[in-house]
C-alpha cells in the first residue's frame, strides 16, 4: 500500500506540474494565433490512453488510439519507393484533402488533447517549432502565418519561456497556500528569547547554546526559519548576541556540513524537555514517567534542553539507560531500554514561544521568498555538481521523487513538495541546453541581439544533440534510482 501511495502522489504531482507547464506554452501560443496541433499530459509513444478533439463542430473521443502519421512514403509512377541520396525512403506530408472528413488529421486548426501512458513528462506541440514533435517534412515547407517560425522573435521568446514562468508562479502560489492553509503560524526570530540550541557541528564553528541570532550578512529577518536556513551554509557572517554582547561568526562554504548535519545545526530547541504525553505501553510509561515530568539526564549526560535530548539520545539506541527526570520537586531516575530508533516513548511539549498567524499578504510574500530561496539553493547545487563537489549519483529521478513524497498521503507535505518541484522544473527548463526551453530562448536571444535568425539546419542539429543528451541523462537518473533501491 505504501508503494501505491508513493506512485499515486508522484503521478498526481507530476501531472499537475506538466499540465501547468505545457499549459503556459499553450496559452502563449494561442495568444499569438499559433496553432497547437497536440496537447498531451504524459508521453504517448505509438498509442494514447485517451484523446479528444473537436471535429466537424463536435467533440470526438478515442480510447487506446494509435498515433496516426502526418507523412506517407514517396513512390514513383510504378508504385516503387523513392529513395534519397543516402538510400533511405523518402516521405512527404499527407494530402489532407484526400483524407475522409472524420479523419482527425483533416482538421489541423483544432487541438488534439490527450493523456499518454508514459508518465515522464508531456508536451505541447507548437506548429512550426523545431523540436522533437516536428517532422522534417513539416519544416521543409514554407512558413505559414499560423506557425511559430513565422512570428517575430519577441513573441517566440514569450512562447518558449511561458512554461517556465507559469511553473514559477505556481510554485510561489503553492508555497503561499501551504503557509496560509496548513502551517498557518510562524515562529518570529525575536520570539526565540532563550536563544538557539547549537548542535555539535554548529559548536565547532563557534556557536554556543543560548546564542540569539541578530542578523545574517547584515540582514534582519522576521521569521526564524529565514535566518537559520540552508543559505547559511554557503558562506555568511552571522551576528549573534551572547551574554548581552554582539559578535560575528564567519561561516565559510560548508556544503558538506549541510549534507551531513541533516538539519541538526541550529534549532530553537533551547527549552526544557517537558513531557507533554506518554505513549501507552511504552518504556517510559512502564518506568513511571508522567505528563509534566522534565527529562534532565541520560546516563551521566546532563540534559538541560530538548535540543540536548535530541542530540545525545541516539548513542543509546538498543541500550538500557538510566534516565533522570524531575517529578514535581523530586528528582527521580529509572532504567529504560531504548529501541533501535532511540525513542524514549514520550512526546515533548511544543516550543514555549509565541507564534504569529500568517496573513494573506504574508503568505504571498513568504511564498515568493521560499520559492526564491529554493531557486538559489538549486543554483548552488548545480555549481557544486559542475565543480565536482557533488556527484552525479546524487541526482534523483522518478523513483527518488516518489520516495520524497513518501508512503503516507499528507496534503501539506504533498503540496509543499509539489511547490518545490515546480520551482526546480522552472530552473531546469530555463537552462540554455538545446531541447529545453532555455535552449530555444538562447537561440531567440541571439536573433534579437544580432538581428539574424539562426539557420534551421543549426537548430535541428542542436535539437537532436540536446535530446540525445537529455535522454541519456534520463536513463542515467532512472538507472541510478533503481540501483539505490537495491544498494
Question: Residue ranges of each PLM-predicted region?
Answer:
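Juxtamembrane extramembrane loops of integral membrane proteins
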Residues: 129-136, 193-254
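Internal alpha-helical transmembrane segments
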Residues: 9-13, 19-20, 31, 122, ...
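Small-residue-rich helix-interface/hinge motifs
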Residues: 3-139, 428-450
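Final/C-terminal transmembrane alpha-helix of multipass membrane proteins
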Residues: 461-481
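PDZ/PDZ-like domain segments forming the peptide/carboxylate-binding groove
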Residues: 178-222, 261-297, 301-304
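PDZ/PDZ-like peptide-tail recognition elements
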Residues: 159-192, 227-277, 285, 322-324, ...
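Functional transmembrane alpha-helices
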Residues: 141-154, 262-286, 294-297, 301-427, ...
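Terminal peptide-recognition signature
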Residues: 21, 115, 202, 210-213, ...
Amino acid at each position: 500500500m505504501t508503494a501505491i501511495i508513493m506512485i499515486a502522489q508522484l503521478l498526481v504531482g507530476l501531472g499537475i506540474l506538466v499540465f501547468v507547464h505545457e499549459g503556459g506554452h499553450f496559452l502563449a501560443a494561442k495568444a499569438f494565433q499559433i496553432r497547437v496541433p497536440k496537447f498531451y499530459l504524459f508521453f504517448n509513444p505509438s498509442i494514447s490512453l485517451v484523446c479528444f478533439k473537436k471535429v466537424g463542430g463536435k467533440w470526438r473521443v478515442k480510447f487506446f488510439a494509435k498515433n496516426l502519421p502526418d507523412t506517407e512514403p514517396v513512390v514513383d509512377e510504378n508504385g516503387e519507393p523513392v529513395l534519397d541520396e543516402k538510400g533511405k525512403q523518402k516521405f512527404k506530408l499527407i494530402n489532407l484533402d484526400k483524407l475522409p472528413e472524420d479523419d482527425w488529421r483533416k482538421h489541423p486548426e483544432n487541438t488534439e488533447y490527450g493523456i499518454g501512458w508514459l508518465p515522464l513528462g508531456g508536451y505541447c506541440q507548437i506548429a512550426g517549432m523545431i523540436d522533437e514533435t516536428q517532422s522534417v517534412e513539416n519544416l521543409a515547407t514554407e512558413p505559414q502565418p499560423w506557425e511559430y517560425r513565422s512570428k517575430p522573435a519577441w513573441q517566440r521568446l514569450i512562447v518558449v519561456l511561458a512554461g517556465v514562468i507559469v511553473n514559477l508562479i505556481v510554485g510561489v502560489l503553492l508555497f503561499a497556500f501551504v503557509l496560509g492553509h496548513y502551517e498557518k503560524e510562524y515562529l518570529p526570530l525575536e520570539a526565540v528569547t532563550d536563544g538557539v540550541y547549537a548542535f555539535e557541528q554548529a559548536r565547532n564553528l563557534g556557536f554556543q547554546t543560548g546564542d540569539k541570532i541578530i542578523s545574517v550578512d547584515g540582514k534582519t529577518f522576521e521569521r526564524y526559519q529565514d535566518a537559520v536556513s540552508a543559505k547559511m551554509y554557503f558562506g555568511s557572517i552571522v551576528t549573534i548576541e551572547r551574554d548581552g554582547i554582539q559578535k560575528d561568526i564567519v561561516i565559510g562554504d560548508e556544503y558538506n556540513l549541510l549534507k551531513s548535519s541533516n538539519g541538526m545545526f541550529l534549532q530553537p530547541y533551547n527549552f526544557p524537555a517537558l513531557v507533554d504525553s506518554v505513549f501507552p505501553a511504552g518504556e517510559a510509561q512502564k518506568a513511571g514517567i508522567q505528563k509534566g515530568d522534565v527529562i534532565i539526564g541520560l546516563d551521566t549526560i546532563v540534559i538541560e534542553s530538548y535540543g540536548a535530548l535530541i542530540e545525545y539520545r541516539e548513542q543509546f539506541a538498543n541500550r538500557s539507560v538510566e534516565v533522570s527526570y524531575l517529578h514535581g520537586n523530586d528528582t527521580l531516575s529509572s532504567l529504560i531500554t531504548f529501541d533501535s530508533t532511540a525513542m524514549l516513548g514520550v512526546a515533548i511539549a511544543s516550543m514555549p514561544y509565541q507564534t504569529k498567524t500568517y496573513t494573506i499578504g504574508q503568505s504571498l510574500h513568504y511564498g515568493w521568498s521560499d520559492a526564491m530561496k529554493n531557486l538559489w539553493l538549486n543554483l548552488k547545487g548545480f555549481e557544486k555538481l559542475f565543480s565536482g563537489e557533488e556527484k552525479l549519483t546524487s541526482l534523483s529521478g522518478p523513483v527518488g521523487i516518489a520516495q520524497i513524497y513518501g508512503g503516507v498521503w499528507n496534503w501539506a507535505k504533498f503540496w509543499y513538495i509539489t511547490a518545490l518541484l515546480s520551482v526546480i522544473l522552472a530552473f531546469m527548463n530555463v537552462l540554455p541546453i538545446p531541447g529545453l526551453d532555455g535552449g530555444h530562448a538562447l537561440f531567440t536571444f541571439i536573433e534579437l541581439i544580432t538581428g539574424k535568425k539562426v539557420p534551421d539546419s543549426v537548430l535541428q542539429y542542436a535539437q537532436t544533440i540536446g535530446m540525445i543528451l537529455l535522454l541519456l541523462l534520463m536513463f542515467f537518473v532512472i538507472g541510478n534510482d533503481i540501483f539505490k533501491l537495491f544498494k
